[in-house]
Amino acid sequence: MILLGVNIDHCATLRQARYRQAEATAGGPIEPDPVTLALAAERAGADGITVHLREDRRHIQERDVWRLRESIATRLNFEMACTPAMTQLALKLKPESVCLVPENRQEITTEGGLDVTAQRDRVRACVEAMNAAGIQASLFIDPDEQQIELAAQLHAPCVELHTGAYASSYPQPTSRTKEFQRLRMGAARAHELGLIVNAGHGINYVNIAEVRTLPHLHELNIGHSIISRALFTGIDEAVREMKVRMNP
């Protein structure tokens, strides 16, 4: 069975669109609350909760991750830039897992996989720190053989394959087939190297029918499509429907 990690970043995006000041000046309850949403997602069957605390704090805030750490019953997957400050925060937070992702202040959302080659020493230091602390470290990378092999060399126990290029090419059959084959080969190579294989980015209620057939999948991290569907159906139904489509 493929596990579902629900990314709740965009609940915080909606909150921050209205409330950017301190809670004391908000004039009442601040909604929507990401922690409340996370608990509802868990009740609906989410196997874990994923949040990305960006360095620019554009959506999830540090207080959110600490409240989540204290509140949720499943697993906390903490997405973070590979920086000394974030590494120290993660070691204090002690989530079940961290996922190292690239960040660009001009991007709307994460635009590609982490370039492990360019940040080899920094990634190694972070992975070693997480391994020593008993926190599972995952690298969010494109399905590129060189990146996957380097992840294994740096002793990362897990990779999350970036499915964004596949999702973007979905309407074009030729490009879609090419990108899906890259994902298949990447998943197979990661598995050969003993890595846990996760995937995420751009997965929705349509392309999940194909994504779920990728070999050796352990977990999918899905956010925007679930939060979008929840606006119409509620978070319970949105999570349950995705779980059904992932594991029919």
UniProtKB/Swiss-Prot annotation:
Q: What is its EC number?
A: 2.6.99.2
Organism superkingdom: Bacteria
Its GO CC terms are: cytosol
Q: Which PANTHER family match?
A: PYRIDOXINE 5'-PHOSPHATE SYNTHASE (PTHR30456:SF0)
> Which example biological process does GO assign this protein?
pyridoxine biosynthetic process
Q: Where is this site: Transition state stabilizer?
A: E160
Q: Which UniProt keywords apply?
A: Cytoplasm, Pyridoxine biosynthesis, Transferase
Binding residues for 3-amino-2-oxopropyl phosphate: N7, R18, G202, G223, H224
Predominant localisation class = cytoplasm
Question: In which compartments does the protein localize?
Answer: Cytoplasm
Transmembrane ranges? none
Show the GO MF annotations. Answer: pyridoxine 5'-phosphate synthase activity
Q: Which of this chain's residues are annotated to bind 1-deoxy-D-xylulose 5-phosphate? A: D9, H10, R54, H59, T109
Q: Which Gene3D superfamilies match?
A: Aldolase class I
Record pathway: Cofactor biosynthesis; pyridoxine 5'-phosphate biosynthesis; pyridoxine 5'-phosphate from D-erythrose 4-phosphate: step 5/5
Q: What is this protein called?
A: Pyridoxine 5'-phosphate synthase
Job of this protein? Catalyzes the complicated ring closure reaction between the two acyclic compounds 1-deoxy-D-xylulose-5-phosphate (DXP) and 3-amino-2-oxopropyl phosphate (1-amino-acetone-3-phosphate or AAP) to form pyridoxine 5'-phosphate (PNP) and inorganic phosphate.
Q: What gene does the UniProt entry assign to this protein?
A: pdxJ
Quaternary assembly: Homooctamer; tetramer of dimers.
What does the similarity note say?
Belongs to the PNP synthase family.
User: Which NCBIfam families would you find in this protein's record?
Assistant: pdxJ, PRK05265.1-3, PRK05265.1-5
Q: Where is the active site?
A: H52 (proton acceptor), E79 (proton acceptor), H201 (proton donor)
Catalytic activity field? 3-amino-2-oxopropyl phosphate + 1-deoxy-D-xylulose 5-phosphate = pyridoxine 5'-phosphate + phosphate + 2 H2O + H(+)
What Pfam families does the record tag this protein with?
Answer: PdxJ
